[in-house]
């Protein structure tokens, strides 16, 4: 399968290759689809914002209408308020317990696989985030044999795609099976998907940090405000915005693999990711007035998260001095899913996600129930 990738992330971006954002036809399809979509899906779609990305010798340039359009700003403010209200109502309904979760030993592999598929198929960051959330919820309360973990993740991703993407982006069964080298039959996938939905209680409205990030970036002028103290002066603000967006994408890809962050409010995670990016770039203050207002947070609330995220970043860089070499496959709205390349492993570039499995194909059935295939 052909996929565009970057092999370096450096200050000059000279080797960057970034796929173009969805064109006008895609936008028209998305808007026309709203009329037929369930109400729960419309909320997720409203939080998205299209933009344009293209390759430059020095920068990853983009257009974010909300930065200068009062109407778009008002829309994003409404979206952010709605998301925060939903968070107040739903946060705490699921608590991740790493000691009780049955998949912790394999979670990083499953998360990396989900990120890689979403990057290769150009799915949005919310799709990846929701798929990971579904996987955690199912595997936290259900004993699943190791041989079925990959199948569970596959079905969680399929459900997330149906929930977050437009109908035209939902993969066919043939495509779905190709993600795992056709190791699972259509019948076993359908049965597992039903089992996953039952385990989730058909409650698919999961709110994740990715839902907040785009609105917060729009409401904070791309994370860099007019009153910010930046090292090189106002003339470099656009450059700082682009650097900040890059760092946000990479840092968030590390955060989704950290189980210690799973029980934090999604809005605070999103705010902390942006604040951490500001600290990393030397932008002061850490938490701008715009970010405080957008996320309804105080610096005191997110400082522990910022300190933790900076530690995550430092540890990742220490483990791999070639952290510049980041596997990047596509852009989604104004975020990009980043898949860090494992140290000493070329499996991502050589084989592709279609051949990456956690274990062998399940010899039995979903949740180890003895169902006979037709």
From Swiss-Prot:
Keywords: Cell cycle, Cell division, Cyclin. Transmembrane segments: none annotated. GO terms for biological process: cell division. It comes from the Eukaryota. It holds the Pfam family Cyclin_N. InterPro entries: Cyclin, Cyclin-like_dom, Cyclin-like_sf, Cyclin_C-dom, Cyclin_N. Belongs to the cyclin family. Cyclin D subfamily. This is Cyclin-D. It comes from Ostreococcus tauri. The gene is CycD.
